[in-house]
Amino acid sequence: MTSVSLTVDAVTKEFNRRSIFRDVSFSLRSGESLAITGRNGSGKSTLVKIICGLLSPTRGSLAYVVDDKSIEVDAIKDHIGLVSPYLQMYDEFTGLENLEVLSRIRADHDITDAVITDALKNVGLWERRNDYVRTYSSGMKQRLKYAFAMLHRPEVLILDEPTSNLDAEGIAMVERCVKEQSSRGMLIVATNDPEEATWCVQRVVLGSEKK
């Protein structure tokens, strides 16, 4: 089993000289979990993007180690599964076609037709696999994001607003994903929901919210 560790050291992010957050530090390894909490506008999604390598910090550093080897942040994407509001699927493709196309991004992983089938079944979309995503409800689109995020059994699963647009059945699906990830990999959850924060052992609070 691949082991991953992440060290975030005094990370600060500024936009137009305005500080979004300052001096965020934490460390995680496989089998550990972290909730990123804070009021709206405190920078939770921004921090998630930095952790994923989609944004660079203004100051501070991130260090990933995979199986005792240092990995550049840009290369960590192969080890990450991400679910977030800013991750978009292809409306002009079917649900199945989305996973087939997106699986090519994971070309270094053995993603077979059977793996894609299981992913769609696990999120309850198998019966709608041949429907265009533009006909999906917002909750179904969120489920499809989970299917893609879990497709390659990521060592690091990052969830930003994890139960957005989901009904009770969808939330139960998310909780199964969280339980599976917690048993074998690293889990990071960015949320305003106190219940979702309890999925994680550690917590980073952004903004003026108190621990």
Regions inferred by a protein language model and the residue ranges of each:
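Helix-to-loop junction immediately C-terminal to a conserved catalytic motif
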Residues: 52
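Q-loop/switch helix immediately C-terminal to the Walker
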Residues: 86, 92-107
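The feature captures the beta-strand-to-loop junction immediately N-terminal to the Walker
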Residues: 37-39
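Conserved ABC transporter NBD signature motif
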Residues: 60-71, 75-76
